[in-house]
């Protein structure tokens, strides 16, 4: 059968495999590429190259494939620490995840940890692949494991009863044996992902937001703020709000400029200069955002899920304690904040991944799922994500 020409007109969805070590995440990833993409062997995926995201080195493998209705970008990480870092830095944003669980073992510590992390960093949907079912003779055992997985997902606020659980053997699918638990299970899995994980709203369809990178004044014209539009669209003549650091204030965009050309509008992904009415040179600064009025609020207190770098990764050499005061780098600027550790935690070691509360000295335009780096004098010592806004 001739492969259909690769068309970019299908909606795009980012997903990834998560789950306990050795439960078959990488084998499953390879098996999916065999039936839906350009086949990538296990060792091509396992020898993932290192990348840097927010000053942190992460090994991640990227594969792409497509179903009849969608194009998928899929991430798989070789090691557990890579998963933690990947999910927290958002290096590979996931619109949904495939949770791989070995039918013989059932949920294990990292299964739990990845589900919790998924909840904290805002992975909205999960589909389960129960792997290695050929290693379990008793069908009742498989049912028990399925119940256990559903209960575990429900305990972390995922809809455990509704989540599709596909049973199969990724290895059989790779080797082209035992079609029912091999190839058929992979096809059933992708069908479930197609149906259960919704297509995310495209960046241009979301409310406008642009982090301010630089500000300058043009004599006779006014103040221009430059940056890369994170999401949405801005049109000349629209009202915008300046949020963060100081009290919010409104302005009107009187011009959009890109590569020295005047445009009617700018959209997500564009690097633009926005001409602002009635704002003087000191009225706006790097670290603030321009956004659709009322769409984002400034906050100073939040709960974070964070990963603290090891010494080998260029992080701290020593632990930190309660009332630690580093800088939190949001989008384009550092803001000092104080860390409040959870009860029962005395100190945090380099290499730890934990949840704590932060109070910033100045407000930042903040939403849940916003990523940040933790820095000391310009050096990255950790990465985090806003898991909950407190005030």
Swiss-Prot record:
Region named G1: 19-26
Domain of life: Bacteria
Record-listed GTP binding positions: 19-26, 76-80, 131-134
Binding site for Mg(2+): 26
SUPFAM superfamilies xrefs: EF-Tu/eEF-1alpha/eIF2-gamma C-terminal domain, P-loop containing nucleoside triphosphate hydrolases, Translation proteins
Subunit structure: Monomer.
Name of the molecule in the record: Elongation factor Tu
Species the sequence originates in: Cereibacter sphaeroides (strain ATCC 17023 / DSM 158 / JCM 6121 / CCUG 31486 / LMG 2827 / NBRC 12203 / NCIMB 8253 / ATH 2.4.1.) (Rhodobacter sphaeroides)
């Amino acid at each position: 059968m001739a492969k259909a020409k690769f068309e970019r007109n299908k909606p795009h969805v980012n997903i990834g495999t998560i789950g306990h070590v050795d439960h078959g995440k990488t084998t499953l990833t390879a098996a999916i590429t065999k039936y839906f993409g350009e086949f990538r062997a296990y060792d091509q995926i396992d020898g993932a190259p290192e990348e840097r995201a927010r000053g942190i080195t992460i090994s991640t493998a990227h594969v792409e494939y497509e179903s009849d209705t969608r194009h998928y970008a899929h991430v798989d990480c070789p090691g557990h620490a890579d998963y933690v870092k990947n999910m927290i830095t958002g290096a590979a944003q996931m619109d949904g995840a495939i949770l791989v669980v070995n039918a013989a073992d059932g949920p294990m510590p990292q299964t739990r940890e990845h589900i919790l992390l998924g909840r904290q960093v805002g992975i909205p949907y999960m589909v389960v692949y129960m792997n290695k079912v050929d290693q379990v003779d008793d069908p009742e055992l498989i049912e028990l494991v399925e119940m256990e997985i559903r209960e575990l997902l429900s305990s972390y606020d995922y809809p455990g009863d509704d989540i599709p659980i596909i049973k199969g053997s990724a290895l059989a699918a790779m080797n082209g044996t035992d079609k029912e638990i091999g190839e058929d299970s992979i096809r059933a899995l992708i069908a479930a992902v197609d149906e259960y994980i919704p297509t995310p709203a495209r960046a241009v369809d979301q409310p406008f937001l642009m982090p301010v990178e630089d500000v300058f004044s043009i004599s006779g014209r006014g103040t221009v703020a430059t940056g890369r539009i994170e999401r949405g669209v801005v049109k000349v003549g629209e009202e915008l709000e300046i949020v963060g650091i100081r009290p919010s204030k409104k302005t009107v965009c009187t011009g959009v400029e890109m590569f020295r050309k005047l445009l009617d509008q700018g959209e997500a992904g564009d690097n633009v200069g926005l001409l602002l009415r009635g704002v003087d040179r000191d009225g706006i600064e790097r670290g603030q955002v321009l956004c659709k009025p009322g769409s984002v609020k400034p906050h100073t207190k939040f709960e974070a899920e964070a990963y603290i770098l090891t010494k080998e990764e260029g992080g701290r050499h020593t632990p930190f304690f309660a009332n630690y005061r580093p800088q939190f780098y949001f989008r384009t600027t550092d803001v000092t904040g104080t860390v409040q550790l959870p009860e029962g935690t005395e100190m945090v070691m380099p290499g730890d991944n934990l949840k704590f509360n932060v109070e910033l000295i100045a407000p930042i335009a903040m939403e849940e799922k916003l990523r940040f780096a933790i820095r000391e004098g310009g050096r990255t010592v950790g990465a985090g994500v806003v898991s909950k806004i407190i005030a």
